[in-house]
Structure formats: C-alpha cells, structure tokens
Amino acid sequence: TNRISELDELILLDDNHEVIVDVGGNKTSSLVLDEIKKVGSFGNIKWIIPLGDGELDGKNAIATMKKIRKIEKNPEDNIIFALNRAISMDEDYYNEQFINFFGHKYLDSNSVICDFVKDPKYFPVKNDKVITMSRYLGSTVWEMAYNNTDFAAKAIQAKEVGDIESARKYLFFRRIQTEAKDYVLNTLNK
C-alpha cells in the first residue's frame, strides 16, 4: 500500500537523515512496528517511547521497548523515552513523579524501565494545557504552532459579517496557536 511505501522511503533515507519514530501504545503504532520489523532497522531510526507516570503507562512502555529491541540493532543509542506531562522540570521532582521509569528505593515497584536498561536515554516533557489541546485536536504541538491558518484574519472577517460566534471560535484557535508557539520556543527548544 501507499503507507508502507512511505514507511520504506523513510527507512531508506541516506545517512544524513535520522528517522524519528514516536511510538505510542495504540493499534497503529503496533502495525508500524510490525512493518518495520519485517524489513529491519538500518541504524538511522531514533525511537521515542512516550511514558506517562501511571503504572499501565510503564507496562506499555516496557512492552513497546521489548518489541523495538527485536528490531533495533543498537537499542541503547536509539531508544529514547519521553517522560510526558512532567509536573516540574526539577530533576528530583520528576524522578519521583516517574516511579515507573526510575523506581524508588522506599516504594515497592514491580518492574520499571531502569530494571531493563542500565542508563536509559530520556527527556521530560513539561505538562501544559497545549498538550491537552493537541490530544483533543489530533495534532502535535508543533503542528498547532505552525499551522498556516491566519485565525486573526478569520476572526475579523467573521465579525465583519456579524458572525460573532465564529469570530470567538477563531480567537480561541488563535490563542491556542500562540500558546503552542510559546511552548515550542520556550519549552521544547530549550
């Protein structure tokens, strides 16, 4: 199919490119992993495994990591965990928030990521309402930030024709767009 051809093209990019695969825990991500497993990894794929702070999030991340290890030749270098919705960017704080990743010496934990990987690569992702909005809208924060729609102009046009409710809606989306840009520039790009 066309999607498999697109996936093949990504995998076969030259050495000057790295493919970043954000591996979620849904059916689509399982299908993508199954397809990549059929052809293998060529060393240019970086696997990002999202991880929330819940127990089930940890179990899903471990299962996903195990699938990727069967595909990836160099998992220590190419698997990276995104610690999603970190309440604070303070290292001590997110170390305790993500017990499913780091474990805790005083709390009994079944199995955590650090039980399977000696020094896992990771980065915390600060929680923000734009992340919640991105999930509801089915877009990444980056896509929301750099959407080319001029919501301000649309709001003015709607107001000029007397459609105040549409004008409010466009202002709402303009606000989200602005907040997403701020998040990308001031949080993600740091």
Model-identified regions with their sequence ranges:
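Residues at alpha-helix caps and immediate loop-helix transition turns in enzyme cores, especially N-
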Residues: 32, 60-61, 93-94
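Conserved Switch II/interswitch segment of TRAFAC-class P-loop GTPases
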Residues: 24-28, 44-62
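Structural beta-sheet core signal
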Residues: 21, 47-49, 81-83
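Switch II (G3) loop of P-loop NTPases
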Residues: 14-33
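C-terminal lobe/tail of nucleotide-utilizing enzymes
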Residues: 78-80, 85-190
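Walker A/P-loop NTP-binding active-site region of P-loop NTPases
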Residues: 1-13, 17-18
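Short, surface-exposed basic-aromatic patches at helix termini and helix-loop junctions that form
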Residues: 12-16, 34-43, 65-73, 99-103
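Conserved C-terminal guanine-recognition region of P-loop GTPase G domains, centered on the G4
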Residues: 37-41, 55-90
